[in-house]
Regions:
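Surface-exposed, charge/polar-rich loops and edge strands
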Residues: 2-42, 46-185
Length: 185
Protein backbone atom coordinates (compact mmCIF):
# COMPACT_ATOMS: atom_id res chain seq x y z
CA UNK A 1 0.00 0.00 0.00
CA UNK A 2 1.48 3.41 -0.93
CA UNK A 3 2.68 5.78 1.78
CA UNK A 4 1.57 9.42 1.63
CA UNK A 5 2.54 12.49 3.65
CA UNK A 6 -0.14 15.14 4.20
CA UNK A 7 0.45 18.65 5.50
CA UNK A 8 -2.50 20.65 6.82
CA UNK A 9 -2.46 24.42 6.46
CA UNK A 10 -3.21 26.65 9.43
CA UNK A 11 -3.94 24.00 12.07
CA UNK A 12 -3.19 24.79 15.73
CA UNK A 13 -1.61 28.14 14.82
CA UNK A 14 -2.14 30.94 17.34
CA UNK A 15 -5.08 29.12 18.90
CA UNK A 16 -6.95 28.93 15.58
CA UNK A 17 -8.32 25.75 14.00
CA UNK A 18 -7.48 23.47 16.91
CA UNK A 19 -7.22 19.75 16.26
CA UNK A 20 -5.87 17.17 18.67
CA UNK A 21 -3.54 14.88 16.79
CA UNK A 22 -5.22 11.80 18.28
CA UNK A 23 -8.53 12.98 16.79
CA UNK A 24 -6.84 13.71 13.45
CA UNK A 25 -5.39 10.19 13.31
CA UNK A 26 -8.90 8.84 14.02
CA UNK A 27 -10.26 10.81 11.03
CA UNK A 28 -7.60 9.31 8.78
CA UNK A 29 -8.32 5.80 10.04
CA UNK A 30 -12.07 6.39 9.45
CA UNK A 31 -11.24 7.06 5.78
CA UNK A 32 -9.70 3.60 5.51
CA UNK A 33 -6.10 4.78 5.74
CA UNK A 34 -3.67 2.62 7.70
CA UNK A 35 -0.90 3.21 10.23
CA UNK A 36 -1.63 6.96 10.46
CA UNK A 37 1.15 8.73 12.36
CA UNK A 38 1.32 12.41 13.25
CA UNK A 39 4.37 14.53 13.91
CA UNK A 40 4.21 17.75 15.90
CA UNK A 41 0.95 19.63 16.40
CA UNK A 42 0.60 21.36 13.02
CA UNK A 43 -1.17 18.63 11.07
CA UNK A 44 1.62 16.50 9.65
CA UNK A 45 0.34 12.99 8.92
CA UNK A 46 2.16 10.02 7.41
CA UNK A 47 -0.10 7.13 6.44
CA UNK A 48 -0.76 4.26 4.04
CA UNK A 49 -3.65 4.25 1.58
CA UNK A 50 -4.91 2.25 -1.35
CA UNK A 51 -5.94 5.51 -3.06
CA UNK A 52 -3.43 6.45 -5.74
CA UNK A 53 -5.27 9.50 -7.11
CA UNK A 54 -3.72 12.29 -5.01
CA UNK A 55 -6.26 15.03 -5.89
CA UNK A 56 -9.13 12.70 -4.91
CA UNK A 57 -7.25 11.73 -1.74
CA UNK A 58 -6.74 15.40 -0.85
CA UNK A 59 -10.46 16.14 -1.28
CA UNK A 60 -11.42 13.13 0.88
CA UNK A 61 -9.20 14.40 3.70
CA UNK A 62 -10.42 18.01 3.41
CA UNK A 63 -14.08 16.88 3.37
CA UNK A 64 -13.60 14.62 6.42
CA UNK A 65 -11.82 17.32 8.42
CA UNK A 66 -14.57 19.81 7.60
CA UNK A 67 -17.29 17.34 8.66
CA UNK A 68 -15.47 16.44 11.87
CA UNK A 69 -13.97 19.74 13.02
CA UNK A 70 -16.12 22.37 11.29
CA UNK A 71 -13.41 24.05 9.20
CA UNK A 72 -11.64 23.17 5.98
CA UNK A 73 -7.87 23.56 5.93
CA UNK A 74 -5.98 23.18 2.68
CA UNK A 75 -4.31 19.78 2.61
CA UNK A 76 -1.09 19.37 0.67
CA UNK A 77 0.07 15.84 -0.08
CA UNK A 78 3.42 14.50 -1.19
CA UNK A 79 4.68 10.99 -1.78
CA UNK A 80 7.92 9.83 -0.15
CA UNK A 81 9.63 10.12 -3.56
CA UNK A 82 8.42 13.72 -3.90
CA UNK A 83 9.58 14.57 -0.37
CA UNK A 84 12.96 12.95 -1.06
CA UNK A 85 13.17 15.18 -4.15
CA UNK A 86 12.30 18.27 -2.07
CA UNK A 87 15.23 17.44 0.19
CA UNK A 88 17.57 16.75 -2.74
CA UNK A 89 16.65 20.08 -4.40
CA UNK A 90 17.44 22.16 -1.30
CA UNK A 91 19.40 25.07 -2.82
CA UNK A 92 21.11 25.74 0.53
CA UNK A 93 22.32 22.16 1.09
CA UNK A 94 25.91 22.69 -0.02
CA UNK A 95 26.39 25.97 1.81
CA UNK A 96 28.37 25.88 5.04
CA UNK A 97 26.84 27.31 8.19
CA UNK A 98 23.18 26.85 7.26
CA UNK A 99 21.21 26.16 10.42
CA UNK A 100 18.32 23.71 9.79
CA UNK A 101 16.05 25.41 12.33
CA UNK A 102 16.28 28.63 10.28
CA UNK A 103 15.37 26.99 6.98
CA UNK A 104 11.73 26.81 5.96
CA UNK A 105 10.19 24.86 3.10
CA UNK A 106 6.90 26.25 1.84
CA UNK A 107 4.84 23.53 0.14
CA UNK A 108 2.53 24.85 -2.58
CA UNK A 109 -0.69 23.13 -3.64
CA UNK A 110 0.33 23.57 -7.28
CA UNK A 111 2.84 25.30 -9.51
CA UNK A 112 2.54 29.08 -9.76
CA UNK A 113 2.29 30.75 -13.14
CA UNK A 114 5.39 32.46 -14.55
CA UNK A 115 4.13 35.98 -13.79
CA UNK A 116 3.54 35.20 -10.10
CA UNK A 117 6.87 33.35 -9.88
CA UNK A 118 8.71 36.37 -11.35
CA UNK A 119 7.05 38.74 -8.84
CA UNK A 120 8.11 36.59 -5.91
CA UNK A 121 11.66 36.13 -7.14
CA UNK A 122 11.98 39.92 -7.58
CA UNK A 123 11.36 40.56 -3.86
CA UNK A 124 14.31 42.13 -2.04
CA UNK A 125 14.94 39.73 0.81
CA UNK A 126 18.35 40.62 2.28
CA UNK A 127 19.55 39.16 4.67
CA UNK A 128 16.89 36.50 4.25
CA UNK A 129 16.99 34.34 1.15
CA UNK A 130 14.29 32.88 -1.04
CA UNK A 131 14.57 30.24 -3.74
CA UNK A 132 11.77 28.61 -5.70
CA UNK A 133 12.15 25.05 -6.92
CA UNK A 134 9.12 23.34 -8.48
CA UNK A 135 6.15 23.39 -6.09
CA UNK A 136 8.26 24.50 -3.14
CA UNK A 137 9.82 27.68 -1.84
CA UNK A 138 12.94 27.46 0.27
CA UNK A 139 13.36 30.34 2.70
CA UNK A 140 16.42 30.88 4.87
CA UNK A 141 16.30 33.23 7.86
CA UNK A 142 19.93 33.71 9.03
CA UNK A 143 18.80 35.95 11.91
CA UNK A 144 15.98 33.60 12.93
CA UNK A 145 12.26 33.58 12.29
CA UNK A 146 11.14 35.59 15.32
CA UNK A 147 11.04 38.88 13.38
CA UNK A 148 11.38 38.05 9.72
CA UNK A 149 11.44 40.67 7.00
CA UNK A 150 10.17 38.07 4.56
CA UNK A 151 6.63 36.79 5.10
CA UNK A 152 5.72 33.52 3.43
CA UNK A 153 2.03 34.41 3.88
CA UNK A 154 2.53 37.59 1.82
CA UNK A 155 4.32 35.50 -0.78
CA UNK A 156 1.44 33.02 -0.76
CA UNK A 157 -0.94 35.88 -1.63
CA UNK A 158 1.31 36.97 -4.49
CA UNK A 159 1.38 33.43 -5.85
CA UNK A 160 -2.41 33.02 -5.43
CA UNK A 161 -1.84 29.40 -4.38
CA UNK A 162 -2.51 27.80 -1.00
CA UNK A 163 0.63 26.80 0.83
CA UNK A 164 1.91 25.61 4.17
CA UNK A 165 5.40 25.90 5.63
CA UNK A 166 7.51 23.44 7.61
CA UNK A 167 10.99 23.86 9.03
CA UNK A 168 13.80 21.72 7.69
CA UNK A 169 13.93 19.46 10.74
CA UNK A 170 10.24 18.62 10.29
CA UNK A 171 10.68 17.94 6.57
CA UNK A 172 13.51 15.47 7.16
CA UNK A 173 11.67 13.80 10.04
CA UNK A 174 8.56 13.30 7.89
CA UNK A 175 10.64 11.59 5.22
CA UNK A 176 12.22 9.37 7.87
CA UNK A 177 8.75 8.41 9.14
CA UNK A 178 7.53 7.71 5.60
CA UNK A 179 10.54 5.52 4.80
CA UNK A 180 10.07 3.58 8.06
CA UNK A 181 6.37 3.06 7.34
CA UNK A 182 7.11 2.03 3.76
CA UNK A 183 9.64 -0.56 4.96
CA UNK A 184 6.85 -2.29 6.95
CA UNK A 185 5.01 -3.19 3.74
Amino acid sequence: MPVVISLLRGVNVGGHNPIRMEALRAVYESLGFHDSQTYGQSGNVVFQTKERNLPRLTKQIEDAIERTFGFRPAVIVRTPAELRDVIARNPFAERRGIEPNKLLVVFLVGSPDENARAKVLAIKTDPEELRMEGRELYMYFPEGMARPKLSWMAIEKMLRISATARNWNTVTKLLEMAVNLDSKR
